[in-house]
């Protein structure tokens, strides 16, 4: 899969997508360190300054309750931490394993805490960040429960931000419409929530420009979110 799809770029956009090597090297270093950093907490939460919550539930390997093995979704932790630093968003991460999948449909502690944060800090948007396997035919997929968990304007704004950085193809609601976290937030609040599945080919620091443009897309989207107001 190519890093950038030139077919979706105008000439001016192609000129933008030439990142300075020093900037790219610094980005690579930051992502590596953010992924490596760890706490002893089961669930790690950091307060932000804008009413957006970034969530990464699958950052560690764990044995599921049914005995099957779930591998961590590499660099989803670093992506969330990096974007929180850039945008002032809140963040919540499953830092260590207790054998329970936070994205299952049943209510459990992680989702309880997620809802508490949403209510306490008047969060307006949740991005549920996941990693998809490399065989999927998309760079990133947007899951919105078939368009009901977020406004069409929000989804279109995200798609535009991705297109502006040359990220393609972008899938929607197939095969991942949104899991337990997306359904829990949508079913228990009146806010917007999207599940994002980032292809493994775009989460590889061997070629950091792929992840750089993904993060730049999401950063630009978050900074332009219509309901964005300082807390």
Residue ranges and their predicted role:
Residues 1-231:
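N-terminal catalytic or cofactor-binding beta/alpha core of small enzyme domains
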């Amino acid at each position: 899969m190519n890093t950038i799809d030139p077919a979706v770029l105008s000439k001016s956009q192609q000129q933008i997508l030439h990142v300075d090597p020093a900037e790219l090297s610094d980005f690579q270093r930051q992502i590596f360190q953010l992924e490596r950093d760890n706490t002893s907490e089961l669930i790690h939460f950091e307060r932000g300054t804008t009413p957006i919550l970034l969530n990464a539930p699958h950052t560690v390997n764990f044995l599921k309750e049914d005995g099957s093995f779930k591998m961590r979704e590499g660099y989803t932790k670093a992506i969330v931490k990096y974007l929180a630093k850039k945008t002032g968003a809140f963040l919540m991460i499953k830092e260590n394993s207790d054998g329970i999948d936070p994205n299952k449909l049943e209510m459990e502690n992680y989702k309880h805490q997620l809802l508490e944060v949403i209510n306490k800090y008047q969060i307006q948007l949740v991005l549920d960040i996941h990693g998809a396997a490399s065989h999927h035919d998309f760079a990133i997929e947007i899951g919105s429960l078939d368009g009901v968990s977020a406004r069409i304007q929000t989804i279109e704004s995200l798609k535009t931000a991705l297109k502006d950085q040359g990220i393609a193809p972008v899938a929607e609601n197939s095969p991942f419409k949104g899991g337990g976290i997306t359904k829990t937030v949508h079913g228990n609040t009146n806010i917007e929530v999207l599940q994002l599945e980032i292809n493994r080919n775009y989460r590889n620091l061997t070629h950091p420009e792929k992840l750089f443009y993904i993060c730049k897309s999401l950063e630009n989207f978050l900074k332009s979110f219509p309901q964005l107001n300082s807390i």
